[in-house]
Design a protein with these regions (language model features):
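Conserved "HGTGT" condensation-loop signature of ketosynthase/thiolase-family condensing enzymes
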Residues: 1-132
Length: 132
């Protein structure tokens, strides 16, 4: 519930709807508990039409620096027009109904939602993008 609320509040704060987001940088810790709950929350808010990936496989879990690192990657996706793939993903859970990308791909990315869900329920979602 906390992840879903964080994403909805980020959209509301930015004056956007779910359809305005082109890419979601998932918190994506590669644990069953986190990935299943985050995947369900993303599906509830966005359905399965928004490209999603986790970039923690590139950097490892940087704890307190994870959020800013993922925000930088999100802005690079906007600047360079790509969706970063999730490295080291071996199989996808068919119960998680989102558009999860394992390969880098070119795309027009105007707005990104970046999730950071901390220990003990500290949930944050940040909307980043081009000024329109």
């Amino acid at each position: 519930l906390g992840a879903k609320m964080a994403m909805q509040r980020a959209l509301n704060s930015a004056g956007l709807r779910a359809g305005d987001i082109d890419y979601i940088n998932l918190h994506g810790t590669a644990t069953r508990s986190n990935d299943a709950s985050e995947g369900k929350a993303v599906a509830d808010v966005f359905g399965n039409r928004v490209a999603c990936s986790s970039t923690k496989g590139w950097t490892g879990h940087l704890l307190g620096a994870a959020g800013i690192t993922e925000a930088i990657i999100a802005m690079l996706a906007v600047e360079h027009g790509f969706v970063p793939g999730s490295v080291n993903t071996q199989h996808l859970d068919p119960a998680i109904s989102i558009d999860y990308r394992i390969e880098n791909s070119q795309a027009e990315v105007r707005r990104v939602l970046s999730n950071s869900f901390g220990f003990g329920g500290s949930n944050s979602s940040l909307v980043l993008g081009r000024k329109t």
